[in-house]
């Protein structure tokens, strides 16, 4: 059932920084290849927004969204995230080439 699908997904929510920037959180997500296309990423990000607020964070920030990850970028924008800009060549790919990254944030 779908319950088994959810057992193979996760996210990690943590402070993006410490001290005066400690109210900004960051998250990492993992969705198994076999579970893609089931809108689980959307459920994880939505839950993360709720949990971040519940734990006293004011902003959820994604530091390194790869520019070519159009599915994630579309999802984040649909959920109300705002792109901060573009960092040219900010992500080193497995083949050694570099790709732009697009930081995003969402006020909680």
Segment roles from a protein language model:
Residues 31, 37-54, 73-78:
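Conserved acetyl-CoA-binding loop-helix of GNAT-fold acetyltransferases
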Residues 36, 62-72, 90-95:
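Conserved beta-strand-loop-alpha-helix junction that forms the acyl-donor binding cleft
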Residues 52-65:
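Conserved GNAT acetyl-CoA-binding A-motif
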């Amino acid at each position: 059932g779908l319950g088994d699908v959810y057992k193979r997904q996760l996210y990690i929510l943590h402070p993006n920084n410490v001290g005066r920037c400690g109210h900004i959180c960051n998250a990492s997500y993992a969705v198994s290849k076999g579970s893609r296309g089931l809108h689980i990423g959307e459920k994880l990000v939505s839950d993360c927004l709720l949990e971040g607020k519940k734990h006293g964070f004011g902003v959820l920030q994604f530091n390194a969204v790869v520019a070519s990850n159009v599915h994630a970028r579309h999802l984040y924008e649909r959920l109300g995230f705002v792109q901060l800009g573009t960092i040219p060549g900010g992500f080193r790919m497995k083949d050694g080439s570099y790709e732009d990254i697009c930081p995003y944030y969402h006020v909680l």
